[in-house]
């Protein structure tokens, strides 16, 4: 397996409707969330960060976030999408375990999930990075923000301090 650079994008779902009487997993995006998601998708495309594989939480708001992001990525090859129930309530170690199982041929991976797992995973994996992004992941990712990490080794080798946090991007 090659150890050339990989990119990990940890995206918190976009802004959702308030908690109501129904199950949390069924909350939908609100109008702001729809706009945020499309903006993030367009930004990923413009930055050349179109994923080859996307892991998406089965929660409605995460699926809707991905649908909007995907619609804004452009006309290139569609990423493989893996909808995962276990992402809904995954902790940091659970998510790192999922990431370790990713095929080594995948170079750019997007995870659409929830807080605090997205930011806590970025903080755990990041051995170094600029102080601004590190401070942001320590505080938590706002809705529709993503942490971009460079991973120099294989996915199977992901562990504490095994990636570099490059940036945190959030919609306007």
Task: Please provide the spans of the model-predicted regions.
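Alpha-helix N-cap/helix-start capping motif
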Residues: 59-63, 115-116, 143
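Short phosphate-binding loop-to-helix
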Residues: 86-104
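Conserved histidine-centered catalytic loops in small-molecule metabolism enzymes
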Residues: 52-73, 150-172
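Active-site-proximal alpha-helix that buttresses catalytic centers in soluble enzyme cores
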Residues: 2-88, 130-131
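A glycine-rich beta-strand to alpha-helix segment
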Residues: 106-126, 134
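Residue-level preference for the first positions of well-ordered beta-strands
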Residues: 8, 108-110, 146
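Domain-level recognition of soluble alpha/beta enzyme cores
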Residues: 126-166
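Glycine-rich phosphate-binding loop signature in dinucleotide/nucleotide-binding domains
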Residues: 47-49, 102-106
């Amino acid at each position: 397996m090659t150890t050339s650079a990989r990119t990990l994008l940890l995206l918190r779902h976009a802004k959702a409707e308030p908690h109501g009487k129904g199950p949390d997993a069924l909350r939908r995006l609100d109008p702001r969330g729809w706009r945020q998601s499309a903006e993030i998708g367009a930004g990923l495309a413009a930055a050349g960060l179109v994923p080859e594989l996307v892991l998406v939480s089965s929660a409605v708001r995460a699926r809707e976030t991905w649908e909007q992001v995907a619609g804004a990525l452009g006309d290139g090859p569609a990423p493989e999408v893996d909808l995962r129930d276990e992402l809904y309530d995954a902790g940091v170690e659970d998510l790192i375990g999922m990431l370790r199982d990713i095929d080594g041929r995948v170079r750019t991976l997007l995870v659409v999930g929830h807080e605090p797992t997205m930011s806590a995973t970025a903080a755990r994996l990041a051995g170094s990075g600029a102080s601004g992004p590190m401070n942001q992941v320590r505080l938590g990712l706002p809705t529709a923000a993503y942490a971009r990490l460079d991973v120099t080794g294989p996915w199977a080798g992901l562990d504490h301090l095994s990636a570099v946090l490059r940036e945190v991007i959030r919609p306007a």
